[in-house]
């Protein structure tokens, strides 16, 4: 009767609540049901042609694995479905295969060709899963296939697949370490990846494969520091741990001058003149030492690491907080380490497991940096609900923090703890009292008296621990405490704990001259019970007998011989050896041994008092937060924390500005695709097109002319433009010839195609200058390098007339629509007089007023032609108001059909959007012929957040999942306001609504037009007039909520600058500061 439920359960049915999963198996499963019938229904469902049944079967199988049941016998039935076309089934199949591929290697190898096909699947999850399964098959014969797959995945478009490639690297390395050199090449490539999803995984692979290759980190150091705050929490832990060891090898110790600056640690960065004057006794020595030590100045990269990790102290992950804490402890100057104390104390409110690890580290830190935790002394008070291990660790911390100021409070706490029912905890408390008495002389007598009172305690363990501690304290002042020794001697009849009895006997023997009458009587009692004592007590009885024989042989000679005779035949060989050794020393032989003459010096020599130290004293040589530190033993795979270097290594190895500029310009070649988009689809926005496609001086003049509203303004701006252009052209005129040649080649290459596309959207392009036609008529598929144009400005004598001509054309063609980007609700000032008041402060304030600049993001890929089966889709932020809804961000979507068949019914499917985000779809595109391209406009309301908008691009036959994530600078629109209005609004947005950061502007970014161009390229803000030449102000409003965003850049001498952002949206303000600083300092 019981066979049925057992059989049905084996088929995959889950047990009900409270029902044992294996309850029926012992009764009948092994008798009535055969193994070949297990999971038969699941095998049948997997063999059907219906995807729904296969999906249900796979869900049940994965649920079985999650519950810990063995599903390996289903491997043949599951592996057949790896080629299933249903994406959901395929995902679950790969989940199963990852679990069992290593166990069923032969069967997994049969499907290896299917896994290889999965590596080319359009779905990124399938590609990643296929690589994960492939790396789980631990067979050396497929190592070349795995290596090839990892290399391809490292270049995959999806960061998720690249992350999986990083995970596969250590697996392959453990399978075949000979592949190390090739794997290092892949690691080097992935370290250069700028995606936060990949960073943590590749650093983990670096740590396991080649942690000694520190040269791979040099050029990626700053990038890792800047990405750190956005990496997932486990990646943050790995990166911080690696950067801690890296910093210990590349920077000087920030505490190197503290020995000379102990009186004033805050001056450690600048010099030691004051401390030299403070110590008159050691003035000569200090003077001699000073020339050898230069004043410590922290390396900027060292400061970058400390600054970027500090916010992570507020992380919700205890592991991240612990990682940052150990980094600060090992790397930060003494004056800055204190910031970690509050974060660590916060973790003490977490689970007991977290508390245990945190307290282990706090106990180590509190030995060297006691003052750091003193303000939080009460946080380490012990609760009755704490587990014993937590209590003992808190006790350790309290003992480390005890000093002459707070010792009364600490001792009162200890007095309370002694009454606890937890005996281990009470014993640890008595030891802590002994340590306090040792370390703080003025409370020694108080502690000793308290411990003596504990000798009358009913609990034998309390008495025993007190005896052990008293013995150590008496060694410091034995002559003054004869009465205590007599009191302890009386306890030998009652105390049965071996360590306590041994301690009493040692004390009586060591100070037998203070108790000459009691000591022989104690020996007599011990001789009676010698055979029943523990080994540790027997050894001390022998010692006591030897010492009394040497000092009072008349009374104790026979007793000593009796004890030694008993010990001679003891079962323990240590006791027997000690008895023979002692007899030869104290009892002179017939020959009169030389040792017996010196027996008193050997046995009765004064012994130094023991030093009661914390068990955590020497743990700081292990890296805090590591398993080795927790165990106080070197664990497998532990990497030693390097010592600080004597001389700082060359910091230039981390300088990547020059190669990064090159990469940037190469990357910006792709942006040239968007030039026809700005000139064709958005012919109205002349300033937008010009600002991105022309050289700096030309874009500046165009934006100035287009933002003006009259001929008088444009003429005055042209004068200013000529002056600016002469400055920019004069500094880089030597590069102009090379750039002219590049432009001529580009013109020849694109003349025919550019004419076709340009004429379709701009009628006025026939009369434009040669440089403008070159830019505005370029093909979408062709690429030019606008970044290099900005750097290589033509000579001022030639560029000024060209710029004027373009500005006039822009005024003629595009002036009327240029007012559109700012709608009436977004204008702060409605008073024309107020506007004019700000506009007439100075002529220079209007020069670089880019009101609708081109986004620095450029044209981005939305769907690759391989993943889209011939359909490629790009998008770009147009920075123009969306006609359907002013709260939406306007995007231009580019479709290209690269296949040989027409694509029909292009439209947006059902979007899966986070709360608040909405999409205005573009009209359906009925048909897109082979080789044809088209552009459309859609709007997305991102709800003032940088969350990605996920939706489907659908055709008649396929659906493609795509995602658009906006940079924070594209979530706002520019605002016109006067200087007075700006100051008034800024005054309302202070305190938490104000974010300020300091930065250093590079030499290439100190001119007015460069600063303005970089800021407006990063964020869609309007320039606000300003009366001072070294201050820049920009204003905008967020599109959804209309919240003001005010940006101020105060440039000072030598490139120093201060960036301030005021906004109600604190998150947007913080992200904007980060993006603008990155743009200005690149």
Swiss-Prot record:
It is a peripheral membrane protein. One of its GO terms (cellular component) is axon cytoplasm. Signal peptide: none annotated. GO terms for biological process: anterograde axonal transport; anterograde synaptic vesicle transport; clathrin-coated vesicle cargo loading, AP-3-mediated; intracellular protein transport; intracellular transport; synaptic vesicle coating; synaptic vesicle endocytosis; synaptic vesicle recycling. Residues 666-677 have a biased composition (Basic and acidic residues). Residues 704-715 have a biased composition (Low complexity). This is AP-3 complex subunit beta-2. The gene is Ap3b2.
